[in-house]
Amino acid sequence: MFYQDPFDVIIIGGGHAGTEAAMAAARMGQQTLLLTHNIDTLGQMSCNPAIGGIGKGHLVKEVDALGGLMAKAIDQAGIQFRILNASKGPAVRATRAQADRVLYRQAVRTALENQPNLMIFQQAVEDLIVENDRVVGAVTQMGLKFRAKAVVLTVGTFLDGKIHIGLDNYSGGRAGDPPSIPLSRRLRELPLRVSRLKTGTPPRIDARTIDFSVLAQQHGDNPMPVFSFMGNASQHPQQVPCYITHTNEKTHDVIRNNLDRSPMYAGVIEGIGPRYCPSIEDKVMRFADRNQHQIFLEPEGLTSNEIYPNGISTSLPFDVQMQIVRSMQGMENAKIVRPGYAIEYDFFDPRDLKPTLESKFIHGLFFAGQINGTTGYEEAAAQGLLAGLNAARLSADKEGWAPARSQAYLGVLVDDLCTLGTKEPYRMFTSRAEYRLMLREDNADLRLTEMGRELGLVDDERWARFNEKLENIERERQRLKSTWVTPSAESADEVNTHLTTPLSREASGEDLLRRPEMTYAQLTSLAAFAPALEDEQAAEQVEIQVKYEGYIARQQDEIEKQLRNENTLLPATLDYRQVSGLSNEVIAKLNDHKPASIGQASRISGVTPAAISILLVWLKKQGMLRRSA
């Protein structure tokens, strides 16, 4: 039977991608349905209890700048906040927070249940309704059919999921949850390229059985960082430390002596695992010269005794897991409350997607999250928001939107996936971005919130706060530009105490702030340049914009030069055999990838600068040289 009301957008899956997709589509005014196999696990952290990190924190800030949910949720659930790379330049600084799993899940569910235009329904989806290469709905396990103009698949590791502990395995979407086998079979019938990936998680430890007195503590930062541009530290719950232990030669001997019982090394697991979050078996074998590896003992919550040992993800048998855990300092009497495991699952080649994350072959069908070959909550959330907003735009008969690589880490993520694809779980790093000085955490709102407002993602409260911040930045910069001090002035003596070389000529506040030894806080503590802005976010922007002005201007020039060709469009129907002068290898790769632009084509392995020049000349001769807006 059909459900009585049609929807504009259906989201299948309630993880980090699905919840952002649902919120985005609903915020844009579209009637949205979120289908999940279990309402109680909406926003569940399936692996590590943390949000953010290098590259990942940048994505969270961008999701927040576009009105998303993740940053707000972690501000309400974070039990330890830190700035990573704090001593380095602003481009690579990143926020990370330990999370209370229960509080995080509660924050996500509360937001979803209070979002207008959004209905949540508990039923596993087993089929899609596809008519003439267009998706028009979904069918649940009890045969209930829902119609919609667009469907977003955010099913994580559930598609034909198989859990491995030692040489034993069983079907599962994650520990304690069933897999999605009928939907996996249905998707394999569609003209989509599918393969298998693998990820894993460590055993969870009972905190009462760990001797923390012999371990080093790791505390959060003070003052506490905040994730959301709309948040403040008063929202944070109680803060707690993490602890650090290490593997040792005994640990490594246990692992080496039991490799024949590892499903990965025994050839039972075929899927490729994440390069940058390897299992402890992989670390011991790949880095044989290391006699220890650092392990972070992270609390799972304020009301839980479970500890997440970050760094010992494993699929070895349970008895071996016990030996590994008890070989480490402070863990000699530790008890495991949940075994570690590996999970294999289906993923679909993201090269079959448009930059909007819509399928190139099934109109109205969008993919987001681990189903696209990524790993991590943050990568999933960013894709979910993009897929949700584009599903909403499609249902409203509007053109899709995707950020450029020079505009957002989300743009880098999507371009990498859709252009290059991936053969292993993809993780975001700042090193993946060519223009990372422009793509900082601190300016995510300056880059994206105005666009978010145009798209209908940003509400009035966020828009008002954003404009107030812009005004504060502009007003303060003008004040510093117009406030001067001369070497002979009485205030010069106070200024000189903060300078490595005393003033020799008249200087404005901005001139002084450009000096490497002068911070904004120091400058505004001086009588001549007081008071400091109360708006801490605006104050940070003033300091960064002034200190890095020359570097930022230079990178902006590089971006503009690159964009002249980057945005030159390539016809979707172009057969590259028509372009004389291209090698057979280049023709094959371009016909296989079908890049949407010259920029995408230039990032395909094997497509040379000479081939790009030939393409540009050919497009010009054919009168097909046009650029996207």
Curated annotation (Swiss-Prot):
Q: What InterPro entries does this protein map onto?
A: FAD/NAD-bd_sf, GIDA_C_N, MnmG, MnmG-rel, MnmG-rel_CS, MnmG_C, MnmG_C_subdom, MnmG_C_subdom_sf
- One Pfam family this chain carries? SAM_GIDA_C
Q: Quote the record's binding site residues for NAD(+).
A: 273-287
Annotated residues that bind FAD are located at: 13-18, 125, 180, 370
Which is one GO molecular function term here?
flavin adenine dinucleotide binding
Q: Which GO terms describe its cellular component?
A: cytosol
Q: Tell me the compartments it is located in.
A: Cytoplasm
Q: Which UniProt keywords apply?
A: Cytoplasm, FAD, Flavoprotein, NAD, tRNA processing
Q: Does the keyword RNA-binding apply?
A: no
Q: Name one GO biological process term.
A: tRNA methylation
Q: What cofactor does its activity depend on? A: FAD
Return the PANTHER family for the record.
Answer: GLUCOSE INHIBITED DIVISION PROTEIN A (PTHR11806), PROTEIN MTO1 HOMOLOG, MITOCHONDRIAL (PTHR11806:SF0)
| Family membership noted in the UniProt record | Belongs to the MnmG family.
Q: Which NCBIfam families match?
A: mnmG_gidA (TIGR00136)
How is this protein organized at the quaternary level? Homodimer. Heterotetramer of two MnmE and two MnmG subunits.
Q: What does it do?
A: NAD-binding protein involved in the addition of a carboxymethylaminomethyl (cmnm) group at the wobble position (U34) of certain tRNAs, forming tRNA-cmnm(5)s(2)U34.
The molecule here is called tRNA uridine 5-carboxymethylaminomethyl modification enzyme MnmG
**What species does this protein belong to?**
Salmonella schwarzengrund (strain CVM19633)
Lineage, highest ranks first: Bacteria, Pseudomonadati, Pseudomonadota, Gammaproteobacteria, Enterobacterales
Q: Its encoding gene is what?
A: mnmG
